[in-house]
Amino acid sequence: MIKGLYTAYTGMVNEQKRLDVLTNNLANADTNGYKKEGTTSQTFADELAIKIKDTSSYGLNKKLGVISMDVHLGETYTNYDQGSIKVTDNETDVALAGNGFFAIAFTNKAGETSVKYTRDGAFTVNTEGYLVTKDGDYVLNQAGAQNTDPNARIRLNPNAKITIDELGNIYQNDQLVTRIGVVDFDDYNYISKYGENLYDLVDGGQITASDAKVQQGCIEGSNVNVVDEMVKMITISRAYQAGQKVINTVDETLDKTVNQVGKV
């Protein structure tokens, strides 16, 4: 009977974690280039199989952990499906149709600059003529993106018309100026989210060429389907309530067992 309490409790904890992920998706439904997240669940048998195959800690003393026959949250993953393309007619706005990421020189609050990647192509030209993100981070050219060089910035004439073709080549006054840095990755398991719509390349990840087409005058929205997320929220709410009812039922049964049957 006590096991029933633990099973219901862990189920409620899992639903709460799923709800946290879901609400974050809904909060970023209007964030340019945002990729929604999802969760997976693992049964005791799944976790046991993984543990048996894992020999990384072979021969080491293992601490006692929690063993139960219920379901645990496996992992949180990112869905990289294409988001909707929105037309803005802004000549510095660009969207990617296909797999790939823009490369930017991101500077954190400590003043440290590193190369990060994004699908958010809502760019603008600053007063110095550099192509930057809405947060003021510099957009890199193709060489900078391929070589992870944060100093390979794109500088334009702010007074001349900007034309960008499908390859990302930027023209001004009928002359090729540079090319927007667009790259892809060999394995998306080697990139991690930084904030809401930026990505880091982690150790072991490899940069590859992108086959994405650049669309000028457009931006990519998030790939969050609000209706789907709301349906999931209702399902989670019902599952959470079911867990509460189980706990209440077990609690009432235990109360009768201790206070009534125990007196006999």
Residue ranges and their predicted role:
Residues M1-V264:
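Amphipathic alpha-helical polymerization modules
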